[in-house]
From Swiss-Prot:
CDD domains: PH_DOK1_2_3, PTB_DOK1_DOK2_DOK3. The modification Phosphotyrosine is found at Y271, Y299, Y345. Residues 4-114 form the PH domain. GO terms for molecular function: transmembrane receptor protein tyrosine kinase adaptor activity. Gene3D superfamilies: Pleckstrin-homology domain (PH domain)/Phosphotyrosine-binding domain (PTB). PTB domain mediates receptor interaction. Pfam families: IRS. On immunoreceptor stimulation, phosphorylated on C-terminal tyrosine residues. Phosphorylation on Tyr-345 is required for binding to the SH2 domain of NCK. Phosphorylation on both Tyr-271 and Tyr-299 is required for interaction with RASGAP. Phosphorylated on tyrosine residues by TEK/TIE2. This is Docking protein 2. Highly expressed in peripheral blood leukocytes, lymph nodes and spleen. Lower expression in thymus, bone marrow and fetal liver.
């Protein structure tokens, strides 16, 4: 069993028993393919006696392998082991290897089952395995190549294929510059083409070929999957076309985008620095002449300037000796203002000085009778004649025609 074995060790296989599932230990040997043998995984039963109706050795052909994936935490395994899946066309095997060796077993099986392709381990069971994808080196370049091959394919339903209304069987052709899809109700009709420089990734497995189109394709971006037994041939044809296109492409330098400085330079401004740090004016720089100012209006002159001009005028008239005026900014700091008169109701009753209404008198009527008594001084009475002449009471001329007339004042 040791001749030509790529890897050997112990693996556990989960088997269905009468009363449930049970793990059994096997000696495992992994063999690569040759001209006289197929790549395979052999599980040899241990020294314990095999059960009846069970073969002592199990052989798993790696050419029938569809996927190899690590099992998640939902799959229980023996102590100090980790489980992984090995799916073939006939059945699904659940194997377990020592935790430190599971990665080596999975990688070795993948290299023999899918030669020449980089493997991407899928997630836990229940997630659909995706074909391993390879980056396209000509994505977004602009060169054409010349392979021309045709392959019969069947479209698998995906989001991109449903958007393009692609269903059924078609012919996939590797053209000179693009991957072309031919078919439809009329023969010889090209439905879509995907330029090689716009294909992001492409991959294949035993029964599937798929690629991811860029957004600049006519179909739009998305994944397209095809069922075909010629997946490896399509992959090699595409790889050959892209390699030839890459070798024929001239090495043109990519234009570098203009770099934007982190901080833009700012022109020097005299207001951005202190007054003491301003540089002296250059002798070669002409000094701009001051602009002539128009006649200022009356309200444009500050009040202190108006006060100074009025003070000069009044000084000449009143002959008052001139007084030094303080700076208008500080002229009211220490100025002594006269005290404001107190309000009449601010003083307590009986303390304030007597005013006009502090000595009321009782009104008396018939002022004409009281003021015309004989004890009054007749020298204070005056009469105004129509001619505008004034005479005192003692100088009246007796026996005149109008000595009886009394002038009365009308109401105001």
């Amino acid at each position: 069993m040791g001749d030509g074995a790529v890897k050997q060790g112990f693996l556990y296989l989960q088997q269905q028993q009468t009363f449930g599932k049970k793990w059994r230990r096997f000696g495992a040997s992994l063999y690569g393919g040759s001209d006289c043998a197929l790549a395979r995984l052999e599980l040899q039963e241990g020294p314990e006696k095999p059960r009846r109706c069970e073969a002592a050795r199990k052989v798993i052909r790696l050419s029938d392998c569809l996927r190899v994936a690590e099992a998640g935490g939902e799959a229980s395994s023996p102590r100090d082991t980790s489980a992984f899946f090995l799916e073939t066309k006939e059945r699904l095997y659940l194997l377990a290897a020592p935790a430190a060796e599971r990665g080596d077993w999975v990688q070795a099986i993948c290299l023999l089952a899918f030669p020449g392709q980089r493997k991407e381990l899928s997630g836990p069971e229940g997630k659909q395995s995706r074909p391993c994808m390879e980056e396209n080196e000509l994505y977004s370049s602009a060169v054409t190549v010349g392979p021309h091959k045709e392959f019969a394919v069947t479209m698998r339903p995906t989001e991109a294929s449903e958007r393009c209304h692609l269903r059924g069987s078609y012919t996939l052709r590797a053209g000179e510059s693009a991957l072309e899809l031919w078919g439809g109700p009329e023969p010889g009709t090209q439905l879509y083409d995907w330029p090689y420089r716009f294909l992001r990734r492409f991959g294949r497995d035993k029964v599937t070929f798929s690629f991811e189109a860029g957004r600049r394709c006519v179909s739009g971006e998305g994944n397209f999957e095809f069922e075909t037994r010629q997946g490896n041939e399509i992959f090699l044809a595409l790889e050959e076309a892209i390699s030839a296109q890459k070798n024929a492409a001239p090495a043109t330098p990519q234009p570098q985008p203009a770099t934007i400085p982190a901080s833009l330079p700012r022109p020097d401004s005299p207001y951005s620095r202190p007054h003491d740090s301003l540089p002296p004016p250059s002798p070669t720089t002409p000094v701009p002449a001051p602009r002539p100012r128009g006649q200022e209006g009356e309200y444009a002159v500050p009040f202190d300037a108006v006060a100074r001009s009025l003070g000069k005028n009044f000084r000449g008239i009143l002959a008052v000796p001139p007084q030094l005026l303080a700076d208008p900014l500080y002229d009211s700091i220490e100025e002594t203002l006269p005290p404001r008169p107190d309000h009449i109701y601010d003083e307590p009753e009986g303390v304030a000085a007597l005013s006009l209404y502090d000595s009321p008198q009782e009104p008396r009527g018939e002022a004409w009778r009281r003021q015309a008594t004989a004890d009054r001084d007749p020298a204070g009475l005056q009469h105004v004649q129509p001619a505008g002449q004034d005479f005192s009471a003692s100088g009246w001329q007796p026996g005149t025609e109008y000595d009886n007339v009394v002038l009365k004042k009308g109401p105001k």
